[in-house]
C-alpha cells in the first residue's frame, strides 16, 4: 500500500487511483455517492456550496436525481445556494434536482444563465411555470443566514436590500407566485431604524466540495479556485444535527495533510465521495494558475479588443487611483483590470471578487469568478462581510437598464429570464458602497462606428436602456442619494451622474450630439449639464490611451 506522507501529498504525479485505493481500504467516511445521498430525508433543507461550475459538487447532485428517479425519494426538499450551482455548458448543478416532487422550494443568490442561443435551464422552467417556490436572495445575506442558524440566533437583521426587490415593500425576493405566497423576509423596526429581517432557515444537509480528503474527512482545497462557503455551511448543518457530504477529487491517509491547509475539519464531515473528474470551473478541468499554484507572467494575459465596450471600460478605469481596493462585477466592468494591464498598471489596484480572490488579475469569460496571481483567497462569507460594510474604495458593476430615479436592474429579464443569473452579490456590494461605477449601453442595437475622432451613430437602437421604471430594482437610486453614495453610469455616449434632480450627463463622448443622441433617445430622462465636458479622444484610439493613475 502507498503510504502518503506530507512530502508526497504535493507530488501530483501520484496516480489518483492510488489515493482512492488507499481510501477504500482504510477510510470509513469514504462511501459510494449513492450511499451518501440515501441518507437525505424527505423534506430536508439542503445547502449546496458552489459558484456556477466553480466548486460545484455535481456528482452528488446527480446522485440525488438518480435516487429520486429510482425510488421517488427524497421528496419536497428545499435547496439553498448562496451563490449558485451549475452552468449551461455541461455542469448541470441545480438542474439535476429541478424535478417535480423532488424540489419544492429554492433560495439562491444566482441561477444558471447563458446566451439566448442556449436551452433554458430546467430550474428556470420550473420557476416560470410556478412549479417551485423560488427566491432570489443576495448571496451575502444567504451566508449571513447560515451563520445565524449555526449560532442558534433568530435570524438576519440587515439594511442590505432595503428599497430593492429584496424588500417586502417590493417583491420580498419572490420570483413567482408560489414564493410570494410564502414570504421569507419582513420589515422590522429596531433601534430607531428600519431593517430587513430574515428568520432562520436551519439546514439539514450540506453538500460541499474540496480537492483532497484524508481518512478523517479533513478537507483541503489546493486545486480549487475559491473556498466559497463550505466551512460555514458545514458548521450550520453540524450545529443543527444534520448531515455533511463532501465531494473530493482524491483521498489520502491520515497525517498527510498539513493542518494549516485544512479548510474544513473532519469532525464536521459525515461522508466523503470521490469524483476524480470534477471540473475546476466552467469548461476547465484543471488549471493551476486558477488555484494559485503557479503565477502567470503579466504578458500572458490578453487585453480587450478595440471596440465600443473597451472605450466604456477605459472611461470607467479613469475613476481609479493607485493603491485603491476595488470590487469587480460581470460584463463590461470585468474588462477594467485588462485596461489597466494594457496601460502598464497590472497590480496598481487590488481587486476583490465575491467568490473570494483578492488581488491578482480577475479572469473573464468561462473563468469569471476566479483570478490568477491572487494575493489571497478569502472565504466568501468573510468577503461579503467586507462588501456589506463597504470596506473597499470603489465598485465596478454593469447594468441592464436604469430608470429616472437612478435605479438599476441586473436581476430580471421577463422575456428571457435565464439571460441573467439574478442578483448574486450585487445587492450586498452596492448597499453601502461609497463609490459605484456602472457600465453599460445607452441604447440596445444601435449601429455605431468608432473612429479616432469620435463615436458616429449611424442608426438608432431598438430601445433605450434609460427607462421610466426598471423591471426589477436591484439597486436603489433613492437610497443611494439618501446615503450620499457617489454613483455614475458610463455609457458609449456619455457619463451620467446620479444627482438630486435625477440623471445628468456630465461628460459627452466625442462625436455625440447631446440632444439628438442623449436627451432625445432617453425621452428626457437624462438631461445634459450646462458645463458638460467632452471626454478625451484618447479613449477612442486603437492603442494605449496613456492613463495616469
Model-predicted segments: where are they?
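Short glycine-rich or small-residue beta-strand-to-loop segments that form or flank ligand, phosphate
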Residues: 45-50, 78-82, 107-110
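Short glycine-rich phosphate-binding loop at a beta-alpha junction
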Residues: 46-48, 325-329
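Short conserved AdoMet
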Residues: 41, 239, 321
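Helix-coil boundary and N-terminal low-complexity module in membrane systems
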Residues: 73-80, 102, 135
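Hydrophobic/aromatic residues located in beta-strands of well-ordered beta-sheets
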Residues: 77-79, 244, 326, 351, ...
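Conserved phosphate- and dinucleotide-binding cores of soluble alpha/beta proteins
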Residues: 2-20, 24-38, 52-68, 86-298, ...
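Glycine-rich phosphate/ribose-binding loops and adjacent secondary-structure elements
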Residues: 37, 65, 75, 303-305, ...
